[in-house]
Amino acid sequence: MHSSLIKLGFLLLLIQVSLSHAQLSPSFYDKTCPQVFDIATTTIVNALRSDPRIAASILRLHFHDCFVNGCDASILLDNTTSFRTEKDAFGNANSARGFDVIDKMKAAVEKACPKTVSCADLLAIAAQESVVLAGGPSWRVPNGRRDSLRGFMDLANDNLPAPFFTLNQLKDRFKNVGLDRASDLVALSGGHTFGKNQCQFIMDRLYNFSNTGLPDPTLDKSYLSTLRKQCPRNGNQSVLVDFDLRTPTLFDNKYYVNLKENKGLIQSDQELFSSPDASDTLPLVREYADGQGKFFDAFAKAMIRMSSLSPLTGKQGEIRLNCRVVNSKSKIMDVVEDALEFASSM
């Protein structure tokens, strides 16, 4: 009996440790896998040779991951019989991309450091490296996240901002996930300084804004004409349009210059400057438009805040071996099975 009590006490301690939250740290892989950063960079550089927009796509993947149950790589999971993938959510279907690049990155990392780097951390690192490769700021990514054991499609539909959102709707979505500062919203929206968007997401702005039969009145007339040529009323709505008409592949502050000139591509972007409720966001748009350094600093800080949202840490979740599927047996299940075994032996 005494031996059984010792075993039970040890088991309870193990469970307590397993469910505890460890601290995210930029030095998390310094000893266990310092080469992960070089592997991420090399993989993205190779992908950029054939796909100039992949850096923007990877940043978007990380953003959409963090907005759904925290940064847990749930967006990378494929469909299973027990859950629907977040890839099928409205904000991701036929638009989220870059999964194959993350797959290649993960395979290389597993070869160099087996069972060490989580997919959640890898996506956070890849997002940072993507921004740097496009000319943007660098920051030390806090690592130590674990990967989720399932996807959350319904939560993705509830949490991801939409391109037709008003400013107040945007603020609500950001606040709901823990990003309640105006600088979070304005700086992170600056991720639209590179990359592309599909015509389908701006058709109402161009031809029937708020069911008026007219274009969005905040849209610059010359820019409206340019966009209508790229996205004709009865044209292919999958055609891609640059977010930033000035420097479409560079990560810079021209996104904010565009907003000041009423040349934001999607409604939710222009809302930061043109909405009647923009008293706290408009000054930041002007500040970032006038000073790229201020934008870069704010973006780096906001990325660190976003990437630290509700992480799985310690023994929570798992370190997936393949980012598309959960491991055959999770660490948590190991603990549960040990508990049942000890209980049955008492």
Curated annotation (Swiss-Prot):
Presence of keyword Repressor: no
Binding site for Ca(2+) 1: 65, 68, 70, 72, 74
Gene Ontology CC annotations of this record: extracellular region; plant-type vacuole
Residues that, per the record, bind Ca(2+) 2: 193, 244, 247, 252
Name of the protein: Peroxidase 37
Catalytic activity line of the entry: 2 a phenolic donor + H2O2 = 2 a phenolic radical donor + 2 H2O
Feature type site, description Transition state stabilizer: 60
Pfam families: peroxidase (PF00141)
Function, as annotated: Removal of H(2)O(2), oxidation of toxic reductants, biosynthesis and degradation of lignin, suberization, auxin catabolism, response to environmental stresses such as wounding, pathogen attack and oxidative stress. These functions might be dependent on each isozyme/isoform in each plant tissue.
The entry's keywords: Calcium, Disulfide bond, Glycoprotein, Heme, Hydrogen peroxide, Iron, Metal-binding, Oxidoreductase, Peroxidase, Pyrrolidone carboxylic acid, Secreted, Signal, Vacuole
PROSITE patterns assigned to the protein according to its UniProt record, in alphabetical order: PEROXIDASE_1 (PS00435), PEROXIDASE_2 (PS00436), PEROXIDASE_4 (PS50873)
Record's cofactor remark: Binds 1 heme b (iron(II)-protoporphyrin IX) group per subunit.
Further facts: There are 73 peroxidase genes in A.thaliana.
Residues annotated with Pyrrolidone carboxylic acid modification: 23
Signal sequence interval, chain numbering: 1-22
GO biological process: hydrogen peroxide catabolic process; negative regulation of growth; response to oxidative stress
Superkingdom of the organism of origin: Eukaryota
Glycan-bearing residues: 79, 208, 236
Cofactor(s) needed: heme b; Ca(2+)
Residues bound to heme b: 192
Keyword Transmembrane helix recorded: no
Record family assignment: Belongs to the peroxidase family. Classical plant (class III) peroxidase subfamily.
Catalytic residue positions: 64
Compartments (UniProt record): Secreted; Vacuole
EC number: 1.11.1.7
Organism for this UniProt entry: Arabidopsis thaliana
